[in-house]
Amino acid sequence: MSEFRVAIAGAGLAGLTLARILHRAGIDVSVFERDASIDSRYAGYRVHINSSGTTALHRALEPELWDVFVAASGMPDDSMRVFDDQFRPGPLRDNRDSAGIGRPTDDIPEHLAVCRATARLTLFHGFEEHVFFGHRITGYENVSDTGRVRLLTTEGSVGDFDLLIAADGINSAVRAQRLPEMRVIDLGSRHIAAKVPLTSETMAVLPEDLMCLFAIAKDDAGVGLTFGPLFRSDPGNPIMQRMPAALQEEVRSDYALSIFNITADRCVDDDELFAMTAEELRAYALDRMSGWAPELRTVVEQWDAATIQPLTLRSMVPVPAWDPTNVTMVGDSLHAMSSALGIGANTALRDASELGQRIIDARAAGTPIIDAVGGYEATVRDYGFDAVRASARVGHWVIGHDDIATAGSESARGQ
């Protein structure tokens, strides 16, 4: 009998975490990624990681790499602060809905601030031979005589596998083929995201009250501004000297993720928004904040122009149960959600841990892999789709975007 082989489409956080969990259990796994290299495209900004995420990452990473991850992460004051457009504080936002269900590891706090690009480089280190770049996945074929699945790319097949796992995001071609009934909807919110370098110069002008887990200011007209700082907890740790140069460079800088958000009906149309230069986007945000407190306008003035980009906020719509096969999905390919609760990455990492353990258990027991997939999918339909619904509800209240029950048409803008 041929060796059991797993293919993962997508080398994001969930895909690499799942791959490493399987690899540590001795399972043959290959990851196929559309990008030309691990650092050919900036892989996102700061993300909130809770105990669901840290539990999965602790399972995936060898002890040395776990120490790197912790040293490169931030351990902020865990308050979530709310202000009006005049920078007057309101009640602290309850962060219990953003907590995980894992076991916080090594006395680290429930909430971490993590750079997505740094975490991805950490997961990739030492795993290079299992990740294949330059493969844009277009779908798959079922191979009837072997029961395997053939993974297809723009350049043809990359091989036959016993299990295919889509981890390639909201635009997943695998999910579109596997679950064509699942819709991606536009939540009716437009974002302009940017990094704010946290240097001695910027810290001298930025408000101290923003230095918490997460802060949001909003007016009565559907406009908001968020701020989430990342101060690396131990960037000088000697262990960093044994890491690749790209990873060392990543951890040298602290920054904040700042997002200007506005409801789509109050924003310029998409063609105009997505054609703007970085400085035009900054100017547009400042114009819409013309009456705001100077302390908040300062945040936008400190945006790093090289990182400014417009985004469309989108979500999946949960669907009824389906029968399992040897093709399944994790992360945004299955349950992309509003960013309002900050649990999207954590839900994806929970998927990686949940599915990984079920695959490992099935291989150890000699039980059918489809049973493992079915058990995982039944579970993820509960917690994953609950997260989609909860994030949409909170986003409707906090950001002002549509709830998934009322959201409109599909949108291909932004990721």
What is each model feature region?
Residues 310-330, 335:
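FAD-binding beta-loop-beta segment adjacent to the flavin cofactor pocket
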Residues 2-4, 50-197, 279-282, 286:
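Conserved N-terminal helical subregion
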Residues 23-43:
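Glycine-rich FAD pyrophosphate-binding loop
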Residues 36-56:
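Conserved N-terminal glycine-rich FAD pyrophosphate-binding loop of Rossmann-like flavoproteins
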Residues 88-115, 193-301:
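Conserved FAD/dinucleotide-binding core of flavoprotein oxidoreductases
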Residues 2-4, 66-71, 79-94, 98, ...:
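C-terminal helical "tail/cap" subdomain of flavin- and related membrane-associated enzymes
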Residues 14, 37, 171:
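Conserved Rossmann-like nucleotide-cofactor binding loop
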Residues 2-14:
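Beta1/beta-strand and adjacent pyrophosphate-binding region of the FAD-binding site
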